[in-house]
Swiss-Prot record:
Homodimer or homodecamer. In contrast to form I RuBisCO, the form III RuBisCO is composed solely of large subunits. Disulfide bonds: none annotated. Transmembrane segments: none annotated. The record marks K310 as: Transition state stabilizer. Mg(2+) binds at K177, D179, E180. This is Ribulose bisphosphate carboxylase. The modification N6-carboxylysine is found at K177. The gene is rbcL. CDD domains: RuBisCO_large_III. Because the Archaea possessing a type III RuBisCO are all anaerobic, it is most likely that only the carboxylase activity of RuBisCO, and not the competitive oxygenase activity (by which RuBP reacts with O(2) to form one molecule of 3-phosphoglycerate and one molecule of 2-phosphoglycolate), is biologically relevant in these strains. Catalyzes the addition of molecular CO(2) and H(2)O to ribulose 1,5-bisphosphate (RuBP), generating two molecules of 3-phosphoglycerate (3-PGA). Functions in an archaeal AMP degradation pathway, together with AMP phosphorylase and R15P isomerase.
Length: 428
């Protein structure tokens, strides 16, 4: 590679795709050299001079490293939209998060953020329901939603699974979902589970007067089977489908979104496996990028972390993810490696806080996230001393206390389910 793509005087065009990277050059490699190689490898260049790359082509398509901060190990690169297949997340990632992550010239390289131009945003559907659509679907306009995951993760029969879901709904949950590793195992077949659970969700609706949503996991070995499962849910009268976004893959997600409008289903995104490339702060891809791609493709709600639960994620990171889900215009934040993003009218996603939560954490969750969040509890409901139904009731009671500005201890004086939760989970 002979070209120099450092261009400090370049002002990105409205049609450029902008990426921010964290770069740590290998021993003996200077920062500018590493940035140049990274920019070239992610676009038009190779490891050596290539005769087939004409000066005219290079001038038109070359990347521009327009910002470098060696002390912060940060660079920003502007790429012409001509380099990308419009409407294709896999192709974008093959460029800006592909071979470059394996280059010897860097010890570590991380894609921190991508800012998409409006010309590229227009090629994507975005969420079909989005935050406001989910509120309309559930009939809940003025509070966080309460959800649960059927526990144990796997092992229950379809009948027992549906029973656990029913008790969760009856106790006050708005949403009940499968866990990420429950799909179509012998002990709990997809179609039977979906049919039984949706019937009991309907029963709970008639008993409580509230809408009850079952989020059945349609993750499958093939896109064809995934779509078949989605259509089964449609025929059964479901309102939702759930997908494991990273194991399923970006092509599967785009395929699912293309078919979701006809099915009329909201799409719940479980982010399991994301840490394989997001957790290392020096290498891979940030969770911020994953969240943006989910909104771009058109998932309706996404797990983003909790701050207070069992999953990794600092408060500033989780709040950056929240903002990327819900804001129409995301401001730049250099301290958090967030690029400005105008979402061009694509609907917001509903953020989901899930992982190691108990009812006693609801006041903190409400303080952190406000009203626009789905609070999702697993063991925090099913490990309640009085059972699943009481665990769900305790969550609703804790939420009611938070909405009214009353302490949990005060509210628990007249709510025995919450009192039992406090006795079990609240640290003395």
């Amino acid at each position: 590679m002979q070209r120099d793509y450092i261009d400090a005087g370049y002002s990105p065009k409205d049609t450029d795709l902008i990426c921010e990277f964290h770069i740590e050059p290998s021993a003996g490699v200077n920062f500018e050299e590493a940035a140049t190689h990274m920019a070239g490898e992610s676009s038009i260049d190779s490891w050596t001079e290539i005769a087939t790359l004409s000066p005219e082509l290079a001038a038109r398509l070359k990347p521009h490293v327009f910002y470098m901060d060696e002390d912060a190990q940060t660079v920003r690169v502007a790429y012409s939209e001509e380099l990308f297949e419009l409407g294709s997340v896999p192709q974008v990632l093959s460029a800006v998060a592909g071979n470059i992550l394996s280059m010897k010239i860097v010890d570590n390289l991380r894609l921190q953020d991508i800012a998409f131009p409006k010309s590229m945003l227009r090629e994507f559907k975005g969420p079909g329901f989005g935050l406001s659509g989910i509120r309309e679907l559930t009939g809940v306009q003025d509070r966080p939603l309460i959800g649960t995951i059927v526990k144990p993760k796997v092992g229950l029969t379809s009948e027992k699974h549906a029973e656990v879901a029913y008790n969760s709904f009856a106790g006050g949950c708005d949403l009940v979902k499968d866990d990420e590793n429950l799909t179509d195992q012998k002990f709990n077949k997809f179609e039977k589970r979906a049919e039984l659970t949706l019937k009991l969700a309907e029963k709970a609706e008639s008993e409580t007067g509230e809408r009850k949503m079952y989020l059945c996991n349609i993750t499958a070995p093939t896109c064809k089977e995934m779509i078949r499962r989605m259509n089964i849910l449609k025929d059964l009268g479901a309102s939702y489908a759930m997908i494991d976004i990273v194991p399923a893959g970006w092509t599967a997600l785009q395929t699912l979104r293309e078919e979701a409008d006809d099915a009329g289903l909201a799409l719940h995104a479980h982010r399991c496996m994301h840490s394989a490339y997001t957790r290392n702060p020096r290498h891979g891809i940030s969770m911020l990028v994953v969240a943006k791609l989910c909104r771009l493709i058109g998932l309706d709600q996404l797990h983003i972390g909790t701050v207070v639960g069992k999953m990794h994620g600092e408060k500033h990171e989780v709040l950056s993810l929240r903002d990327e889900c819900v804001l129409d215009n995301v401001p730049a934040d250099e301290s958090q490696h967030v690029l400005a993003q105008d979402w061009g009218g694509l609907k917001p996603m509903f953020p989901v806080a899930s992982g190691g939560l108990a009812p006693t954490m609801i006041p903190d969750l409400y303080t952190i996230f406000g009203r626009d969040v789905i609070m999702q509890f697993g063991g925090g409901i099913h490990a309640h001393p009085m059972g699943t139904k009481a665990g769900a009731a305790a969550c609703r009671q804790a939420l009611e206390a938070s909405l009214e500005g009353v302490s949990l201890q005060e509210y628990a004086k007249n709510h025995r389910e919450l009192e039992a939760a406090i006795n079990k989970w609240l640290k003395k």
